Every structure is written in structure tokens, then in C-alpha cells.
């Protein structure tokens, strides 16, 4: 896992370079609209949430995660999104109780882990789901829903597994059985390109000190139900103290960043990989 985490850290560093450079550079002009403050605000582990009534499936998932880590397949998939690989579109079958299917609950608004283009699903989690279904000799069904509904869907037996960039917490583990971790993640801050508030920050503590100094007149946005919300509102489960800033939730991170540009919020906090993907996408058309 340590080697795997280092590989992903390098790949993610490449992915965020363009936005991080804009945050550090003091020379030259830029047409960028936003920048990512390249300081991790949390340390998290992503895992898949399995139906508690299917212990055999959990073991199969754990075996599969170990396999794709050891044979390099997981690195290969990540390279498609963090480096120079070509993402593969995944087509979902129609759900049919009479068939032997693997039903995956996701929220396809969390690139590069899950997103849609037309009728196809893309992303790290979706490509893993496709390989998992093949390994289990099952037909893959992907059900797209609000992030808040993913674990509930699994808990209620409407889906076999949740694959949606899920951070492992004790509270969430009451709803599902988490697989072994497959990805190490963190939260990062997105600001307007011309915002210099955090330019001199070197550590998480530096960023935290500024964030904790804001009052309710400062609004921080992000995706509903994700770690960013708990970072702002506080959570014993995540170990976050409440900020005095006001939280504003959105269906996805892209909407939050767009509202940042439009002046609807002062800052955005979301997971590092989606932060990089969104910032790069928006700045590419700035």
C-alpha cells in the first residue's frame, strides 16, 4: 500500500501541477479563473461500501483489490486519469432481477473517479467496477444517484456495492461493510486566481489558522455529503472541528466552483483529485 500510495501521489502531483503553479507563481500573466491551494487539509482512505448482508461479496472485493494492486492493474487505471493513458467508457446493463448482476451505486459527478459522457460511465471507480463484474462473472449495472443516497441504497439492499470515492469513517461503517482501502485522498481548497489570502501558506496549520479566523460572513462551498462539508460544519466522525464560516452545498463540485467564479461563495473545499480536474477544466476554457 505504501508503494501504491507513493505512485498515486506522484501522478496526482502531475495532474495538479498546472493549477498549483498558478498559485505559486508571481510572474507572468494568466487567464486562469481559479487555483488549487496545494496543501492537503486531511488524510483519508477511499474504499468500497459493500452490503452487510453479503459477507462473501466483501471477501471477493478484498481479494480483487489486493489482486489489482499487486498486478499493476490499479496503477494502470489511475494512469488513464492522472497521466497519459486513455480512459475507457463503461456501459451499464439494464437492471433485471432475473439475471446474475452486480449492482453498483455511484454518484457520477466526481471526476476522475466517476463521471458520465453521454450514456457511458468513466472514472477510476467505474473501470474497477467493470473489472470486478468480469471477475465475478456478473453483468454490471451502474445506478447513478445523489451522493447522499449511495450508502443508503446499499444499506437498503437496492445495490450490492457503493463505488463513489467513499471516505472510510466509523459512522458510514454502520451502514455498509467497507472493503480494504484502494486509494489515499485528501481535501484541498480552491480559490479565485487573484485571491492571495493563502499564498504564503506552507502547511495545513497555516491554512487552518486562516480558515478558523473567518466568521459566518465567509461562505465555503462544496459537494453535499462529502468530506468538504464535514470539514466546514465539523464532525466527530471525521475528527474535524467546526469552522465559523457558512457552508453552501451543491449537487457536485463543478457547480460549487462555478459559483465561486460568479461570487456566490468565497472558497470551495473538495477532494484533491476532483479539485484538480475541475480547476484544469475550467481554466482550459478561461
Which residue stretches match the model-derived regions?
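Ligand-binding clefts/hinges and TM-proximal coupling segments of bilobed small-molecule sensing domains
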Residues: 36-42, 62-99, 205-217, 221-247
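Periplasmic-binding protein-like
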Residues: 31-58, 108, 183-191, 272, ...
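Bilobed "Venus flytrap"/periplasmic-binding protein-like clamshell domains
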Residues: 108-111, 121-134, 184-253, 272-274
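Extracytoplasmic small-molecule ligand-binding "clamshell" domains
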Residues: 46, 56-76, 80-84, 96-166, ...
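Sec-dependent signal peptide cleavage junction
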Residues: 18-32
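Beta->alpha turn/N-cap motifs
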Residues: 29, 106-110, 143-148, 157-170, ...
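A ligand-binding cleft/hinge motif common to bilobed small-molecule-binding domains
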Residues: 28-42, 148-152, 164-175, 231-234, ...
Amino acid at each position: 500500500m505504501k508503494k501504491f500510495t507513493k505512485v498515486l501521489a506522484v501522478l496526482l502531483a502531475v495532474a495538479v501541477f498546472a493549477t498549483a503553479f498558478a498559485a505559486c507563481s508571481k510572474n507572468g500573466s494568466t487567464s486562469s479563473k481559479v487555483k488549487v491551494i496545494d496543501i492537503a487539509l486531511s488524510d483519508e482512505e477511499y474504499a468500497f461500501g459493500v452490503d452487510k448482508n453479503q459477507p462473501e461479496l466483501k471477501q471477493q472485493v478484498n481479494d480483487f483489490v489486493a489482486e489489482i494492486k499487486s498486478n499493476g492493474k490499479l496503477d494502470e487505471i489511475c494512469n488513464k486519469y492522472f497521466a497519459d493513458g486513455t480512459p475507457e467508457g463503461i456501459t451499464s446493463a439494464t437492471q433485471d432481477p432475473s439475471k446474475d448482476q452486480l449492482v453498483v451505486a455511484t454518484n457520477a459527478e466526481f471526476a476522475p473517479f466517476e463521471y458520465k459522457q453521454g450514456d457511458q460511465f468513466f472514472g477510476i471507480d467505474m473501470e474497477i467496477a467493470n473489472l470486478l463484474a468480469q471477475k465475478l462473472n456478473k453483468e454490471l449495472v451502474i445506478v447513478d444517484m445523489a451522493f447522499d443516497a449511495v450508502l443508503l441504497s446499499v444499506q437498503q439492499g437496492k445495490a450490492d456495492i457503493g463505488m463513489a470515492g467513499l471516505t472510510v469513517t466509523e459512522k458510514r461503517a454502520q451502514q455498509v461493510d467497507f472493503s480494504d482501502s484502494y486509494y489515499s485522498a485528501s481535501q484541498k481548497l480552491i480559490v479565485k486566481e487573484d485571491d492571495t489570502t493563502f499564498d504564503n501558506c506552507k502547511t495545513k496549520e497555516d491554512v487552518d489558522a486562516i480558515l478558523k479566523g473567518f466568521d459566518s460572513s465567509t461562505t465555503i462551498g462544496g459537494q453535499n455529503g462529502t468530506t468538504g462539508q464535514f470539514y466546514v460544519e465539523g464532525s466527530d466522525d471525521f475528527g474535524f472541528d467546526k469552522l465559523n464560516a457558512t457552508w453552501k452545498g451543491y449537487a457536485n463540485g463543478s457547480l460549487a466552483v462555478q459559483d465561486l467564479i460568479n461570487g456566490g461563495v468565497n472558497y470551495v473545499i473538495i477532494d484533491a483529485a476532483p479539485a484538480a480536474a475541475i480547476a484544469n477544466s475550467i481554466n482550459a476554457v478561461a
